[in-house]
């Protein structure tokens, strides 16, 4: 038996049936429709025809004797296939033999339970929602892609913060139950005592001599000390005329100039002092920077091993604008200050004028005293003659045994009083 030959038809694309509204295709989320004859459909359109995002929003309602259905082409219930692909409906005109093809849109119909209890529950939920929650619901239904992405990110962060807070609270309760409040307060005070000591070199409080409290080897290794021979030659052979020129040109700080004036005549001692003074002068100049933009921040005269030491021990590596850079943070400046004080103590037989150093480092007197006390120096006053025959009080710092007890800064003491 020969197969039946179907008549051919020509396609004719007609666009939307009424010029603006596409044909409606429906699918039911809870099954297949058995008897479509008793369905009553109503299509609702957004009245805002000027807004390009809202003018195509549609809601389709369907009613039967038993149940009502609703579907829409926007919001969370909309089908994504409407934006990813196009749907068409073909109607065969038997008279002309043409297949008229119209644009169509697919709606996912979901059952609507309009029970009184559900409506009252929704009304109550709407009343209890905050303004932020209502705005989030609007963004979820009508917001742009960017707004929805920001909403999802905020919700994820909120969940993460809540989980973190619960974990921290649980951990805190466990620690308090284990150690007790008294032990925790004692630990906090002990940590405060060590805050200002984090940037200090190792302190040997059981030393028998002042020079062993802060050992010179912790400041400069033998290789670093050897590398200072060449750059410190100018200081080692400095003359009175050159010192006067330094004063006139203001090329070096006051402490360095005063130290150069009192260099010992003994060759070995003079060499050691010159190297220490040069390194101290380098630290003070290095501290004046905020960001070190190149590897040789202080010029080609600084030995490579010293440059490496400065970048490694006195800067923080940070990432900014796609580039790594060496930053001299406030804590690193405090560390440099501590090293300068220790070098000055080794240069001046463990008694130094803190006021002169404070001015050279451009520090406040309060901050200088905080660091000096954290280093367990004994602070005293002395009248010093200045220009025009006048005198002023200077603070002296002395490293002597036995060491005084470690003192915290005023900021930490105030914080403990407040708590």
Swiss-Prot record:
Question: Per the record, a Pfam family?
Answer: RNA_pol_I_A49
A Gene Ontology biological process in which this protein takes part is: transcription elongation by RNA polymerase I
Record region (Disordered):
397-419
Mostly located where?
Answer: nucleus
Could you tell me the superkingdom of the organism this chain comes from?
Eukaryota
Compartment annotation: Nucleus, Nucleolus
Which terms are listed as keywords in the entry? Acetylation, DNA-directed RNA polymerase, Nucleus, Phosphoprotein, Transcription
Query: Where does the signal sequence lie?
Result: none
- Phosphoserine-modified residues are 35, 163
Choose one Gene Ontology CC annotation of this protein and give it. RNA polymerase I complex
Modifications after synthesis and translation: Acetylated at Lys-373 by CREBBP/CBP, leading to decreased RNA polymerase I transcription. In normal conditions, deacetylated by SIRT7, promoting the association of RNA polymerase I with the rDNA promoter region and coding region. In response to stress, SIRT7 is released from nucleoli leading to hyperacetylation of POLR1E/PAF53 and decreased association of RNA polymerase I with the rDNA promoter region.
Instruction: Using the record's annotations, give every residue carrying the modification N6-acetyllysine.
Output: 373
Q: Which GO terms describe its molecular function?
A: DNA binding; RNA polymerase I general transcription initiation factor binding
- Family per UniProt? Belongs to the eukaryotic RPA49/POLR1E RNA polymerase subunit family.
Self-association and partners: Component of the RNA polymerase I (Pol I) complex consisting of 13 subunits: a ten-subunit catalytic core composed of POLR1A/RPA1, POLR1B/RPA2, POLR1C/RPAC1, POLR1D/RPAC2, POLR1H/RPA12, POLR2E/RPABC1, POLR2F/RPABC2, POLR2H/RPABC3, POLR2K/RPABC4 and POLR2L/RPABC5; a mobile stalk subunit POLR1F/RPA43 protruding from the core and additional subunits homologous to general transcription factors POLR1E/RPA49 and POLR1G/RPA34. Forms a heterodimer with POLR1G/RPA34. Interacts with POLR1G. Also binds UBTF/UBF. Interacts with PWP1.
Record's function text:
Component of RNA polymerase I (Pol I), a DNA-dependent RNA polymerase which synthesizes ribosomal RNA precursors using the four ribonucleoside triphosphates as substrates. Appears to be involved in the formation of the initiation complex at the promoter by mediating the interaction between Pol I and UBTF/UBF.
User: What name is this protein filed under?
Assistant: DNA-directed RNA polymerase I subunit RPA49
Lineage of origin: Eukaryota, Metazoa, Chordata, Craniata, Vertebrata
Q: Which gene encodes it?
A: POLR1E
């Amino acid at each position: 038996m020969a197969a039946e030959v179907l008549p051919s038809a020509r396609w004719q694309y007609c666009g939307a049936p009424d010029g603006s509204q596409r044909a409606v295709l429906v699918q039911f989320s809870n099954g297949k429709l058995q008897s479509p004859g008793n369905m009553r459909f109503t299509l609702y359109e957004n009245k805002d025809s000027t807004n390009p995002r809202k003018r195509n929003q549609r809601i389709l309602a369907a009613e039967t004797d038993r149940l009502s259905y609703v579907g829409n082409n926007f919001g969370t219930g909309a089908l994504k296939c409407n934006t990813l692909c196009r749907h068409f409906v073909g109607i065969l005109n038997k008279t002309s033999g043409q297949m008229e093809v119209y644009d169509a849109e697919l709606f996912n119909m979901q059952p609507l339970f309009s029970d009184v209890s559900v409506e009252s529950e929704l009304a109550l939920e709407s009343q209890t929602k905050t303004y932020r929650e209502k705005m989030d619901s609007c963004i979820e239904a009508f917001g742009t892609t960017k707004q929805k992405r920001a909403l999802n990110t905020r919700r994820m962060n909120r969940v993460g913060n809540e989980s973190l807070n619960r974990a921290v609270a649980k951990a805190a309760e466990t620690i308090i139950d284990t150690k007790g409040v008294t032990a925790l307060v004692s630990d906090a005070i002990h940590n405060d005592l060590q805050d200002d000591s984090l940037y200090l070199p190792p302190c040997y409080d059981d030393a028998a001599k002042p020079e062993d409290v802060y050992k010179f080897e912790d400041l400069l290794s033998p290789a670093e000390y050897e590398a200072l021979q060449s750059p410190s030659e100018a200081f080692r052979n400095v003359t009175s005329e050159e010192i006067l020129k330094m004063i006139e040109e203001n090329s070096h700080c006051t402490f360095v100039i005063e130290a150069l004036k009192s260099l010992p005549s003994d060759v070995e001692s003079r060499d050691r002092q010159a190297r220490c003074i040069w390194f101290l002068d380098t630290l003070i100049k290095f501290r004046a920077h905020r960001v070190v933009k190149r590897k040789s921040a202080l010029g080609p005269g600084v030995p490579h091993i010293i440059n490496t030491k400065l970048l490694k021990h006195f800067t923080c590596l940070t990432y900014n604008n796609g580039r790594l850079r060496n930053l001299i943070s406030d804590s690193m400046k405090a560390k440099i200050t501590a090293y300068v004080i220790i070098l000055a103590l080794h240069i001046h037989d463990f008694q130094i004028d803190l006021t002169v150093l404070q001015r050279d480092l451009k520090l406040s007197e309060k901050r200088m005293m905080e660091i000096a006390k954290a280093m367990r120096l004994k602070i005293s006053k002395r009248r010093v003659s200045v220009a025009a025959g006048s005198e002023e009080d200077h603070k002296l710092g002395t490293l002597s045994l036995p060491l005084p007890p470690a003192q915290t800064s005023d900021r930490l003491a105030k914080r403990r009083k407040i708590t």
